[in-house]
Regions:
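Juxtamembrane boundary at the C-terminal end of a transmembrane helix
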Residues: 275-281
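Membrane-associated alpha-helical segments
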Residues: 154-158, 162-274
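Extended alpha-helical interaction modules
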Residues: 3, 14-178
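Extended, helix-rich structural scaffolds rather than catalytic motifs
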Residues: 9-12
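N-terminal juxtamembrane/topogenic regions of multi-pass membrane proteins
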Residues: 1-7
Length: 281
């Protein structure tokens, strides 16, 4: 169990392996998306949230989750790949019992990283294989990459909802003096709060990357980022943050413009009244 300061939680379920490597594709197919495992993880997460209580700001367990299967294997002999040919690795990572096309095999094993002669890690979007006598560092990097992925996906969904709310607020409020109403003020503050919360979460997740000072761990994380398409979600989040900023800016500018126009009208009316008083006097 790992708890991250930016509001994420990772539950790790360890299952001892026995048997031959050729049986791993069938095992992978059984484990991927397994409802009982997901339920067990959510139960643990719920208990931890209840245990921490007031230490959590706005406690809630999101319906969104991300499961990721990692096979941590011990190296055997001098040839680490002797019992793990590319075709078998690909079937394990893709949880496929049958044969895969050559291009699928190449794609599945394309993200392979090694630190020494006695280890290697193959990362795919659905799972990974770590062959190492001390796999904890690699497992920690993979864990964080998946936390990063689900945070970006959650943030992307939240920003999508925020944009829809902002578009509705802008459409309702950009009609004349209505933009100065109390409701528009609430909408504007809400947009600003969403923008600040999203930007703070984005920075918190990315600042955590600074923990990977080791060059190999940084390279492993980069490989995981590419395979999990985290960069795509980050770009989407940044675009939506910019869109929110644009909407918020336009609402504020329009409010300033309307206030200036109303002030001009008030000044003109006051001058007219003053002149009227002088003429009648």
């Amino acid at each position: 169990m790992t708890i991250f300061h930016f509001g994420a939680m990772s539950v790790r379920l360890d299952i001892p392996l026995t048997g031959v490597t050729t049986a791993l594709p069938q095992l992978a197919r059984t484990l991927v998306g397994q409802a009982d495992l997901l339920h067990a993880a959510r139960t643990v997460a719920t208990e931890v949230i209840q245990l921490l209580g007031p230490a959590i700001v706005r406690p809630a367990l999101s319906a969104r989750c991300e499961d990721y299967l990692v096979f941590a294997l011990l190296p055997e002999g001098n040839d680490l790949r002797a019992g793990l040919p590319d075709e078998l690795i690909a079937r394990i990572l893709r949880a496929e019992e049958g044969a895969l096309a050559p291009e699928q095999v190449r794609d599945a094993v394309s993200a392979c990283t090694s630190y020494g002669n006695d280890d290697f890690t193959v990362i795919d979007w659905n799972g990974a294989i770590v062959v190492d006598r001390t796999p904890e560092d690699a497992l920690s990097v993979l864990e964080f990459a998946n936390v990063e992925l689900i945070e970006m996906r959650w943030l992307d969904d939240r920003l999508e909802d925020a944009l829809e709310e902002a578009f509705r607020a802008a459409a309702q409020s950009m009609r004349g003096a209505r933009i100065l109403s109390v409701q528009t003020g609430r909408h504007t503050r809400r947009i600003a709060e969403l923008q600040i919360d999203a930007a703070a979460l984005y920075e918190s997740v990315n600042n955590a990357l600074k923990l990977f000072g080791d060059q190999w761990l940084a390279r492993l994380h980069q490989s995981a980022t590419q395979r999990l398409h985290i960069d795509d979600y980050e770009r989407s989040v940044l675009r939506k943050l910019e869109a929110l900023d644009s909407i918020y800016g336009k609402l504020r500018d329009r409010q300033v413009q309307i206030r200036s126009e109303l002030l001009e009208v008030v000044v003109i009316v006051l001058i007219a009244l003053e002149m009227l008083v002088l003429v009648r006097g």
